[in-house]
């Protein structure tokens, strides 16, 4: 029998262990779960979203406050349970997030695989003028307008601590 996910929603208190297990399974290790723990401890997380399916969480993403530019968010990590990967859940989650960013006027940056995130609405071209401690060639942007801002990105300290 086919199973379909429920609607994306904010993570609820008490779901941290389920998210931790999802991150460890999706990334085959603790690094992304450790990043989320560090972001939570530092107060950098702006929001955590889950994609439930039945009695489990099969998708997750976190948005964190950038140090600079003020008001910008960064997306990391994004995870989908290994047994449901390939069903475009990530693309759907990213599509809804990028639509929200455009409509709300919120800039969001992400570092990762271009084909994955561009399918969801992020743009590498718009990120071309950004300066970053990470490879700009793998940095993408979502948000208002079709501009290509010229700004310097400073990520939450938790990112550098895990390098």
Feature roles, as predicted:
Residues 103-136:
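Conserved active-site alpha-helix within GNAT-family acetyltransferase domains
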Residues 80, 86-99, 110:
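Conserved acetyl-CoA-binding loop-helix of GNAT-fold acetyltransferases
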Residues 65-67, 82, 144:
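Short, low-complexity Ser/Thr-rich regulatory SLiMs
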Residues 66-75, 85:
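A conserved beta-turn-beta hairpin within the catalytic core of GNAT-like acetyltransferases
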Residues 36-41, 128-130:
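Short, solvent-exposed loop/turn elements at beta->coil junctions and helix N-caps
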Residues 1-35, 44-52, 56-57, 74, ...:
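Short amphipathic alpha-helix that is part of the acyltransferase structural core
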